[in-house]
């Protein structure tokens, strides 16, 4: 079972806020009245007695202490910036396993926490953006991929591992090779929209599949990983609960935000690796 942290955070803020409000409306006036009554009965009030009469219930004390901190975290995380950790190599070489990234939560519109309803439209995903979204088949799981197809686009991926968008071959330039799990891996520089970035292909690894083509419906996006032969993305999703014409598509309501920076790397196992900052920088 996946932990729904946004829901837990909202509940925690609501509980702490309710405790603070109950104290303000109910308990605090009672404490003030008790202190006033005591002071009217003695000539010299005992500081220890005053402290005892003014003491907040322990639960209220904790609630009032945690409320401002949790509220600030909720606002920052829900509407401004949210941190994520990269769990897989599907976005290599752009993102490595163990990278900690920052995601802009307002780039594509302000959304209500937990409900994820867009209340203030600000912008739309652009081709080439690196985007975090909730996996359509399991919305409690966050994925990160690159936006390849926009609403209305036609995307084609060939058995030769070439990408076409709206009938045009996406430009790519050979960069070099690096070691891979099954032989060498070829690196290319690809340009999607205004975004230039590196992609990885295992040219010696052939997939027995025909050329495939998709037309992106309104309000949906087609996503691919930069590690083209090691990415579970829009090309391969298959869920019988999803209509056939929407298979592989990410609906706008599932968008979490735009990934824009790496702020730390800490690969597993954490106990035998130290955090490092050599990969800190903007995500292209």
From Swiss-Prot:
Q: Which InterPro entries match?
A: LexA/Signal_pep-like_sf (IPR036286), Pept_S26A_signal_pept_1 (IPR000223), Pept_S26A_signal_pept_1_CS (IPR019758), Pept_S26A_signal_pept_1_Lys-AS (IPR019757), Pept_S26A_signal_pept_1_Ser-AS (IPR019756), Peptidase_S26 (IPR019533)
Q: What is its EC number?
A: 3.4.21.89
Q: Which Gene3D superfamilies match?
A: Umud Fragment, subunit A
Which reactions are catalysed by this chain? Cleavage of hydrophobic, N-terminal signal or leader sequences from secreted and periplasmic proteins
Signal peptide region: none
Q: Which SUPFAM superfamilies match?
A: LexA/Signal peptidase
Q: Report how it sits in the membrane.
A: Multi-pass membrane protein
Outline which residue ranges sit on the Cytoplasmic face: 23-58
Q: Where in the cell is it found?
A: Cell inner membrane
Keyword Hydrolase belongs to the record: yes
Q: Where are the transmembrane segments?
A: 4-22, 59-77
A single GO CC term, please? plasma membrane
Q: Which UniProt keywords apply?
A: Cell inner membrane, Cell membrane, Hydrolase, Membrane, Protease, Transmembrane, Transmembrane helix
Stretches of the chain found on the membrane's Periplasmic side: 78-284
Q: Where is the active site?
A: 90, 145
According to the UniProt entry, its GO molecular function terms are: peptidase activity; serine-type endopeptidase activity
Entry's family note: Belongs to the peptidase S26 family.
What protein name does the entry list? Signal peptidase I
Instruction: List the source organism.
Output: Pseudomonas aeruginosa (strain ATCC 15692 / DSM 22644 / CIP 104116 / JCM 14847 / LMG 12228 / 1C / PRS 101 / PAO1)
Taxon lineage: Bacteria, Pseudomonadati, Pseudomonadota, Gammaproteobacteria, Pseudomonadales
What would be the name of the gene that encodes this protein? Answer: lepB
